[in-house]
């Protein structure tokens, strides 16, 4: 019997499980596509336009049916960063956020192209970080590309405009879908200002959608008290920055051991909180061979790694709360400024 005849006479029970699953999925996709088209026609029949200027209008049913035809995003790094997201990693200086970002980039580059925009280290500093005591260099995946600013090409024009424009050119010319930017300060020196921060993030969102990018942007945090938990208020710059990010996580320093770091998840849009204050990732930074990296040593509550306030600390905090309140600050403003809860501010003011 010829192969063609066998194929023609094959029954569903003869088919492999994968083949049957593919056919079932194709059937479901066709049904969803037909349903979405029917919803679109129904919308037109009711004289609701498909677009008005900047806005695209679809029924909720059409929206989810069309979205269901696209694959769900895959996790790029644990549950902290997913495909298609603009994610932020922030930490205080010298806590290892660049080390962690390169570690993330290295893992992702095992399967796809990654551009790491390094605006922090020189090439020599980068080389020394990934060289062991015997002078052996770490061998990175071939898909990992480090990008730095060519100082010779800097002109007298708008630096921020040039950086954004060249990010777009990098997306066009490399076809890379994963960008890690270290750090946001080099995208805009005015991120402290709300309007400038909003404009910057709008442009990044445009690039993300236009080229189907996944972005991880590193940022700093001002000096913070080790007795306070990490919150969104610790992200340096305008609060508008935080609102634009799809996901956010941060690195904190343990108060009980200066060699320990903990990683806390602060914002999630896909999936659920896995590494919140009740389950932070506890790590040490070690050089294994010639690769400097975070080593996961377990999980803990954030509270276990916060500094206990002394009587002097409590007294200073109380005086600061009263001083700010006398200046006319609201309880919310005081809580945000001191990075504590509104209920705690209220309790102290009632004493």
Task: Map each language-model feature to its residues.
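Positively charged N-terminal leader segments that act as targeting/secretion signals
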Residues: 2-16
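Conserved inter-motif catalytic segment of the P-loop NTP-binding fold
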Residues: 72, 76-78, 82, 112-199, ...
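Conserved catalytic network of the ASCE P-loop NTPase/AAA+ motor domain
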Residues: 108, 138-139, 170-173, 206-211, ...
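C-terminal regions of RecA-like/P-loop NTPase motor modules
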Residues: 20-42, 54, 172-173, 210, ...
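Hydrophobic positions on the alpha1 helix immediately C-terminal to the Walker A/P-loop
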Residues: 100, 104
